[in-house]
């Protein structure tokens, strides 16, 4: 039976609520006991709304097109049905061996995350389920041998999947499941031609999952390529993305004051817990790291220049609590989330500006998260061209950062949508979080050339759009006020540190970091499993030492500390530091020595405790006794 078309000429979704019962526990989903055991080990207590709705539909063999917020559990929503189907197939035909599932993701970091999740869910399945990540940096010969063994699950970016299909290394003849995670980003990352090639290679009748945080024109395109009458799930959760996040903004902040306030925040421990700092470009990433190193504040960087294994390892160690501060550059976001246009489309900057915003009228009416006013957000007039290295790198979307207490927008994002995804890194899984943003007023832009960035020119206009969007979502962006009289006491120390971080120092640190991470990446690839103790050598928050070292800046004198925070940074010091009383607390060393030597004459014996002799009584003029 044909379904009616809605206002956007899209078939209306089937009413799945009346046909499926929402699961309140994983046991009611009738999953394999081995999967339930793995879920218990991973401390999954009950399914999230997207899992409770999508898993029963997927187990019935239906195509699923789901929209849910970032961090809602979409990965488990498609992995569990895929693993259940594979285990069922293995039970029926134990000797069966084929590639059953192809999972496509836009970035290498997300591919590694999905691959590890699949391994953890199949931990109690023995060798029945095998997963391969095609984005790993291995030779073509090694990759061909892995695919020749016919793993059950293949995780890849579209470009790597197409390359292996064209070389006949990846066979999709017996494929039963196709998953496209973060579907709204796949085409915007420049994979349009790859997805069209895969649509021709994927056999008919394959069950398809499209998972997305938003419904855009890209999702509609992918639905037309791969889906057959999918069940559309639009979950309107009570706690939407950002609902548990306290949002603050410093409205009037000079360009060099960003560094001052960042120093004060971390040195005085105004923020407790792990923090992600978003900056505008790679140079500022290293400039801020070198600046914080002057004060003994350790941090690690995350950008597209680093080897993929190093980037993955940084995220993993951050989630384990090894690092507290990550300075991240989201290259896709900095470029305005430009879509890789086809060669037929013009490359003019104004056309790119129009194409970079793809919300508005193309979004369904039920998706009110993004308003039409944001379609024409201010963008820089010139944008650098996306490199192949940046194509498969992304931070603000998809990557699972755990237990992030604060997101610091050191440089304000270039779109209000990017702001929403940035602050979505904190306040996840029902927890609270904080987001703090620095805004450069127009009259302060360009006054401090060494720390100036072009995107800051539009900060005030972008802030108004951000506030407008957050107001529509029922959230408030509150002003954050610093006591500048107390902050100014640290200004001279900030100036000394900032002068030491020159452009040459930043370039040297950038090159040195890449060289170090290349070596570490080889160690990660070859010795990670064989020599776990070498993980201690692979710290990513070490000092780069490219700037002039000023040891005195690492310690804050007590007289600079605010009254409430005095003594909180130094361990073992009390409130009487620097106090001189009237009574001496230590014995006078000179007086003690005098008392000890009192009564010892020049003619006495050299030895201590000897008998005292009167020289007049012992004097003999004749020399004889």
UniProtKB/Swiss-Prot annotation:
InterPro entries: DEAD/DEAH_box_helicase_dom (IPR011545), DEAD_box_RNA_helicase (IPR050079), Helicase_ATP-bd (IPR014001), Helicase_C-like (IPR001650), P-loop_NTPase (IPR027417), RNA_helicase_DEAD_Q_motif (IPR014014). The keyword Translocase does not apply. ATP binds at residues 68-75. Residues 55-233 form the Helicase ATP-binding domain. PROSITE patterns: HELICASE_ATP_BIND_1 (PS51192), HELICASE_CTER (PS51194), Q_MOTIF (PS51195). Residues 599-610 have a biased composition (Basic residues). GO terms for molecular function: ATP binding; ATP hydrolysis activity; RNA binding; RNA helicase activity. Gene3D superfamilies: P-loop containing nucleotide triphosphate hydrolases. Residues 347-357 have a biased composition (Basic and acidic residues). It comes from the Eukaryota. CDD domains: DEADc_DDX56, SF2_C_DEAD. Residues 1-21, 339-393, 590-625 are annotated as: Disordered. Pfam families: DEAD, Helicase_C. Its EC number is 3.6.4.13. Belongs to the DEAD box helicase family. DDX56/DBP9 subfamily. This is ATP-dependent RNA helicase DBP9. The lineage of its organism: Eukaryota, Fungi, Dikarya, Ascomycota, Pezizomycotina. The gene is DBP9.
């Amino acid at each position: 039976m044909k379904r009616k078309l809605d206002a956007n000429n899209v078939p209306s979704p089937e009413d799945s609520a009346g046909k499926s019962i929402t699961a309140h526990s994983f046991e009611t989903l009738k999953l394999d006991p081995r999967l339930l055991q793995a879920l218990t080990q991973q401390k999954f207590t009950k399914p999230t709304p997207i899992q409770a709705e999508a898993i029963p539909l997927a187990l019935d063999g239906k195509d699923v097109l789901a929209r849910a917020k970032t961090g809602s559990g979409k990965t488990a929503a498609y992995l569990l049905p895929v693993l259940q189907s594979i285990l069922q197939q293995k039970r029926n035909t134990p000797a069966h061996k084929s590639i059953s599932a192809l999972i496509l993701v836009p970035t290498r970091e997300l591919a590694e995350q999905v691959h590890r999740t699949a391994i953890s869910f199949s931990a109690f399945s023995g060798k029945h389920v095998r997963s391969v990540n095609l984005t790993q940096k291995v030779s073509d010969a090694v990759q061909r041998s892995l695919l020749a063994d016919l793993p059950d699950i293949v995780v890849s970016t579209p470009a790597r999947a197409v390359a292996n299909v064209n070389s006949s290394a990846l066979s999709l003849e017996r494929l039963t499941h196709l998953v496209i995670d973060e579907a709204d980003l796949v085409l915007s990352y420049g994979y349009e031609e790859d997805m069209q090639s895969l649509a021709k290679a994927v056999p008919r009748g394959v069950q398809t999952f499209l998972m997305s945080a938003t419904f855009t024109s890209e999702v509609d395109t992918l639905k037309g390529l791969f889906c057959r009458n999918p069940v559309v799930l639009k979950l309107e959760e009570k706690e939407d993305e950002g609902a548990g996040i306290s949002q603050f903004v410093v409205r009037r902040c000079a360009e060099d004051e960003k560094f001052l306030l960042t120093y004060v925040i971390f040195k005085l421990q105004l923020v407790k817990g792990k923090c992600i700092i978003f900056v505008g470009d790679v140079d500022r990433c290293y400039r801020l790291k070198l600046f914080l190193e002057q004060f003994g504040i350790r941090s690690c960087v995350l950008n597209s220049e680093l080897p993929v294994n190093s980037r993955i390892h940084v995220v993993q160690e951050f989630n384990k609590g090894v690092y507290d501060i990550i300075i991240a550059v989201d290259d896709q976001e900095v470029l305005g989330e430009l879509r890789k246009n086809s060669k037929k489309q013009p490359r003019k900057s104004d056309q790119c500006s129009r194409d970079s915003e793809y919300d508005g009228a193309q979004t369904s009416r039920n998706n009110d998260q993004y308003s039409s006013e944001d379609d024409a957000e201010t963008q820089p007039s010139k944008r650098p061209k996306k490199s192949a290295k940046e194509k498969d790198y992304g931070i603000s979307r998809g990557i699972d950062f755990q237990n992030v207490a604060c997101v610091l927008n050191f440089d304000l994002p270039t779109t209000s949508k990017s702001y929403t995804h940035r602050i979505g890194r904190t306040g996840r899984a029902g927890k609270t979080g904080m987001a703090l943003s620095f805004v450069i007023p127009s009259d302060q832009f360009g006054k401090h050339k060494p720390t100036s960035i072009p995107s800051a020119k539009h900060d005030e206009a972008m802030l108004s759009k951000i506030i407008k969007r957050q107001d529509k979502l029922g959230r408030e962006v509150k002003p954050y006020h610093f006591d500048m009289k107390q902050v100014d006491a640290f200004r001279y120390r900030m100036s000394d540190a900032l002068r030491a971080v020159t452009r040459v120092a930043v370039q040297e640190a950038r090159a040195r970091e890449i060289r170090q991470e290349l070596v570490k990446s080889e160690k990660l690839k070859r010795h990670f499993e064989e020599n776990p103790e070498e993980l201690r050598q692979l710290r990513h928050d070490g000092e780069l030492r490219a700037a002039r070292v000023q040891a005195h800046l690492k310690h804050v004198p007590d007289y600079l500390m605010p009254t409430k925070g005095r003594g909180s940074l130094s361990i073992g010091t009390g409130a009487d530091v620097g106090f001189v009383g009237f009574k001496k607390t230590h014995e006078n060393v000179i007086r003690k020595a005098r008392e000890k030597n009192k009564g010892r004459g020049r003619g006495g014996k050299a030895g201590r405790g000897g008998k005292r002799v009167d020289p007049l009584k012992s004097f003999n003029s004749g020399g004889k006794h």
